[in-house]
């Protein structure tokens, strides 16, 4: 395991849909297996091939509500009739073991983490331009026009929140953005 100045540090990465969060996090985890990527809890049913504790922690609605009520989530939200959240206990356990912990979450979740875990280092991932973000979203060719317009409207709002974050990384080039993330997270190369 590589030594890292990020040991025991919680880092939050957020940014609008289509900015490349997933690609950057995947690359970062391949380069730095010492990073622990937080596993979300959800009330939705497990999909075929999903493993409890690997992909998600699958909870019924009552158990999820108990977890939230007890302060056991760093952040949570409801989406499409299901609840999703970041359980506090596994994050704190990994931090106590000295591992750098990474949360890849949406803007509202990042705001909740800012309140519940203020020492977390928060990074906003931004596109080089709004036009490039739109090109990426349309390039996926998976959504109808109405969904694309919703994503773009939400992205405009999210981009206005950049100043709330400890750092902003512009994802114009994947390799350069990964190097910037490594530096911000204090990861040895």
Curated annotation (Swiss-Prot):
InterPro entries: GK/Ca_channel_bsu (IPR008145), Guanylate_kin-like_dom (IPR008144), Guanylate_kinase (IPR017665), Guanylate_kinase_CS (IPR020590), P-loop_NTPase (IPR027417). It comes from the Bacteria. One of its GO terms (cellular component) is cytosol. It holds the Pfam family Guanylate_kin. The keyword ATP-binding applies. PROSITE patterns: GUANYLATE_KINASE_1 (PS00856), GUANYLATE_KINASE_2 (PS50052). It catalyses: GMP + ATP = GDP + ADP. CDD domains: GMPK (cd00071). Its main location: cytoplasm. Its EC number is 2.7.4.8. The keyword Cytoplasm applies. It is an enzyme of class 2 (transferase). Residues 8-186 form the Guanylate kinase-like domain. Keywords: ATP-binding, Cytoplasm, Kinase, Nucleotide-binding, Transferase. Signal peptide: none annotated. It is found in: Cytoplasm. SUPFAM superfamilies: P-loop containing nucleoside triphosphate hydrolases. ATP binds at residues 15-22. GO terms for molecular function: ATP binding; guanylate kinase activity. SMART domains: GuKc. Belongs to the guanylate kinase family. PANTHER family: GUANYLATE KINASE, GUANYLATE KINASE-RELATED. Essential for recycling GMP and indirectly, cGMP. This is Guanylate kinase. It comes from Prochlorococcus marinus (strain MIT 9313).
